[in-house]
C-alpha cells in the first residue's frame, strides 16, 4: 500500500470547555455542523493569516494545518482564549494523510478532485500531493495565501467561508466584498514562473500568482470550478 502521510502538515488539538463555540467565533467556516471543513483565521481587515481543515474528535476539534505555521497558529488562537478553560496544543500522535484515489478517508471539503484525507498515526511520506493540488488550481499555506483578502484566495468557490454562520474575525470586510461581488484579484496557478510569482515550484514547473481578473496570464491554469468567478466583471 502506498505511503500517505503529508509530512509538511501538523495537527493541533483544541480541547476543553465549549470548543466548537470558541472556534466558531473566530474562523471563516461553520464548525457547528458536519466536519471536516476548510477555514481561515483572518486579520480584522479580512486578510489571511492561516488556513486549515477542521476535524472533530469527540468533543475536541483537530486543526489540520501547515506544519511550519502550527506554533504561530497556536499562539494566535491563544490570544482569543482569554479565561476560557481551553487547551490548544500540537497532537504529535496524529498525522495528516492523503490519497488521490484510494477512497479511504473523507473527501477534501474544498474540492472532490483533490482526493481524500484522514488523520491517523504517521506512515511513510506521500508523493505527488503538491503537483496534484496545484494542477487542480488550489492554493494553500502562508506563502501562497498570506496577507491576501480571503475571497481573493478563492475561498467562496472552495467552500472556505460561511456567510450565514454569524461573526468571525475579518467578517465585516469579507461579507462586504461578497455583497458587492467585488473580487478584483485572484490567486491562480500558472505554468512556469515569472517576476510576479508569489511562490515558484520549479520541481513541478508551476507557480502561484496574484493576478487581476481582467488580466489573467496566458499561462494560467483556469479550472472549471473557477471559470464563473473569473467571468465576473472587475471594478476599479
Q: How would you describe each model-predicted region?
A:
Residues 1-236:
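Basic, glycine/lysine-rich polyanion-binding surfaces/domains
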